[in-house]
Amino acid sequence: MAKKKKINVSSGIIHVSCSPNNTIVSASDPGGNVLCWASSGTMGFKGSRKKTPYSAGIAADKVAKTVKEMGMATVKLFVKGTGRGKDTAIRSFANAGLSITEINEKTPIPHNGCKPPKRPR
């Protein structure tokens, strides 16, 4: 197995995608190359526990820890989706000691596009 190269990056981009069932967090360098990622499912949560804010915070903590080991100090956050773990993920990055330069909301909003799915009974 090849040995992993040590990566040093001073700033980067973090994408947080919150669906109704899962939260995916990925970190990349300014060029867009993904450095690390985590989701509620990869952190060991299964089923209905994946959608909780707690699981989103755990996934964000793992990415924040990995990114700090790479030397990243400042990040831009891009948040997408309507899931419940969005705020918890943002707070996790702030509490980890990373300097957040900007937070962008990238949630797609339809201008009377497709019909939304039916509400669960």
Swiss-Prot record:
Pfam families: Ribosomal_S11. GO terms for biological process: translation. The keyword Transcription regulation does not apply. One of its GO terms (molecular function) is structural constituent of ribosome. GO terms for cellular component: ribonucleoprotein complex; ribosome. Keywords: Ribonucleoprotein, Ribosomal protein, RNA-binding, rRNA-binding. Coiled coil: none annotated. Located on the platform of the 30S subunit, it bridges several disparate RNA helices of the 16S rRNA. Forms part of the Shine-Dalgarno cleft in the 70S ribosome. This is Small ribosomal subunit protein uS11. It comes from Mycoplasma pneumoniae (strain ATCC 29342 / M129 / Subtype 1).
